[in-house]
Amino acid sequence: VKTLKDAGFKKLIVTAKHHDGFCIWDSKYTDYDVKESGYKDKNGESDILAEISKACTDQNMDMGLYLSPWDIHEPSYGYKDENGQPTTPENDKKDYNEFYNNQLEEILGNPKYGNNGKFVEVWMDGAKGSGANAQEYNFQKWFDTIQKYEGKGVDGRDADCMLFGAEAYTTVRWIGNELGIAGKDTWSKSKVDKNANTINSNKQGNATVGFEDGNQWTVPEADAR
């Protein structure tokens, strides 16, 4: 983190859980985490997210949280009956939305995570894998949880937590590629429909260029791999 700070970086977004479902903190909601891997730091703790958070706090580096909604490992993902077979939402035996919300609470509600206990952005991604599209996300519940801990006015915060990949609630949008390339002319607004929970950021070629007359401010964020 010090190297990033010295290089001029202002924020670090840490991948606490990617699509594979593996958690880099000791989550009480799954055994697919860093503790079960046998990893321990010099103090005998199994919590990489806490280690990174401490480093960001020491360097006063803003933190963002990447917590993938798509979870290949979690049995409650999708709609399944008591035998684990695909079913309809009303017959679903385990609520994945509650599982994900519990993990949000577990991280955002714990002061040892984040820069001095704070996250300025939650990166939710937008991916759903093959066979997983039936899972509908309860975005409103999740966003209420995020802003409860990270919203404007909470412990002196002067702005709401930024949201990436949050459909119509997005305030930080994907630029449209993983090449670090943005359009020459890019507007910082998208067109969203809260009722349909959709967002249109005007994809042209390999980049989203936004709209001059959009109805929601969505900061375009470029990433490269």
Q: Residue ranges of each PLM-predicted region?
A:
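Mature catalytic domains of secreted/periplasmic carbohydrate-active enzymes
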Residues: V1-R225
